[in-house]
Amino acid sequence: MSNGALRLLAGAGAVDDPVYVDDVFSTYVYTGVYSNTDIVNGIDLAGEGGLVWTKKRNSTRAHDLSDTARGVTKSLYSSAADAEGTDSQGLLAFNSNGYRIGGSSSYNNTNDEYVSWTFRKAEKFFDIVTYSGNATNGRAINHNLGSVPGMILIKSVTSSTYWP
């Protein structure tokens, strides 16, 4: 290619690297071992933030949701009205390539089967925000999606109320 053509291409502007679904989302199936375990799924939760949604597959135990906005050891249960719970042996760390779990029966009980879905914060894909409610209908909640949300989940973390 001629130097002139190279200059034209360079002058056209840089293009961001594409973001693929496996950069921002992971389904991970595992068997519990009841000790601290790193779940390596390639999702950068430490640097980018996100949510880990875990379900024990061989029982009726609730789905556990932990996210970087509320911090490690904090859980919400999608099938319960409970306020935010604390599980000091649940999700222990958000890592640059996944996350670390302890020996909690919600995440890592010996020989129990689990599935986790990890969502990384990314424009036009997923975001987590926290806010204080003020009982105002039609209130706008700021987010970093850069687009209109396709789905919104809301849950009080301080009171026992069902998910709307």
Q: What residue spans do the PLM features occupy?
A:
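Surface-exposed molecular-recognition determinants
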Residues: S2-P164
